[in-house]
């Protein structure tokens, strides 16, 4: 009897069906079939939203107008075409995916700050200090012109050491020589006079202000006299021309009168 009972119970566990016979309490746990439920993303109906979002947030999206929902979709980079329900579904799906992928994003951001040597040792300890290159100093060094340096090599003799060889050494030697030239000195002895060839000669002129004022006055007076003479000459000319014209007119009138009298007499 017991053997038959145990065999029936064992068959029930293997097949997943509960036998019709009575079962003791200690074997009841084996008789309940285990059900594994798996829900996929696309198996959820559109109206039944996920419980990850609060009811307040869901209510706010449902209350929004179509224009406000389009603005929300635009800020999230989603498609703005469609009905109000479709826009709400897109926003909720975006919020759900963002909350689910937040942990993965943090883990990826943490992995970016781990060096290769630490990854090789399988150590998750982050880098303590990162030194960034000085970009300003690098740009400044590129902008500054290259300077010429004199590499001093000890020569075999002292005379060769004093003689300039490179172009920069020659320019420096010329500047030193011109700086060491003494200035010009005048002496009482006219036979021995020191002249400086490169000394600049400044021509200093002494200006007499009174003489210049007198010269200006004379020039102005002469100009006035010349102008008055020209005016008088022009007046005289007009008077003479007018007088001559009057004489000619008078003589012509007298001539024509005499001629008319002679014709009348004849």
Swiss-Prot record:
Keywords: Membrane, Mitochondrion, Transit peptide, Transmembrane, Transmembrane helix. Signal peptide: none annotated. Residues 61-95 form the SAP domain. Residues 1-40 form a transit peptide. It comes from the Eukaryota. Its main location: mitochondrion. Coiled coil: none annotated. GO terms for cellular component: mitochondrial membrane. This is Altered inheritance of mitochondria protein 34, mitochondrial. It comes from Lachancea thermotolerans (strain ATCC 56472 / CBS 6340 / NRRL Y-8284). The lineage of its organism: Eukaryota, Fungi, Dikarya, Ascomycota, Saccharomycotina. The gene is AIM34.
């Amino acid at each position: 009897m017991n053997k038959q009972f145990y065999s029936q119970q064992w068959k029930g566990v293997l097949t997943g069906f509960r036998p019709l016979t009575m079962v003791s309490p200690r074997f009841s746990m084996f008789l309940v079939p285990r059900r594994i439920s798996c829900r996929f993303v696309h198996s959820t109906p559109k109206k039944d939203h996920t419980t990850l979002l609060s009811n307040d947030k869901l209510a706010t999206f449902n209350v929004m107008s179509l224009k406000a929902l389009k603005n929300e979709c635009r800020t999230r980079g989603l498609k703005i075409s469609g009905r109000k329900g479709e826009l709400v579904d897109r926003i909720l799906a975006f919020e759900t995916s963002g909350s689910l992928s937040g942990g993965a994003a943090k883990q990826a951001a943490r992995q970016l700050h781990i060096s290769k040597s630490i990854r090789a040792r399988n150590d998750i300890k982050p880098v303590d200090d990162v030194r960034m290159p000085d970009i300003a100093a690098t740009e400044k060094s590129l902008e500054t012109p290259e300077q010429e340096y004199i590499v001093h090599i000890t020569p075999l003799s002292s005379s060769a050491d004093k003689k300039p060889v490179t172009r920069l050494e020659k320019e420096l030697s010329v500047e030193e020589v011109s700086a060491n030239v003494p200035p010009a000195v005048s002496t009482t002895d006219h036979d021995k006079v020191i002249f400086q060839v490169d000394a600049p000669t400044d021509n200093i002129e002494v200006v007499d202000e009174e003489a210049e004022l007198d010269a200006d006055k004379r020039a102005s007076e002469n100009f006035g006299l010349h102008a008055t003479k020209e005016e008088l000459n022009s007046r005289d000319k007009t008077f003479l021309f007018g007088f001559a014209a009057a004489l000619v007119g008078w003589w012509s009138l007298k001539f024509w009168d005499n001629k008319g009298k002679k014709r009348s007499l004849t």
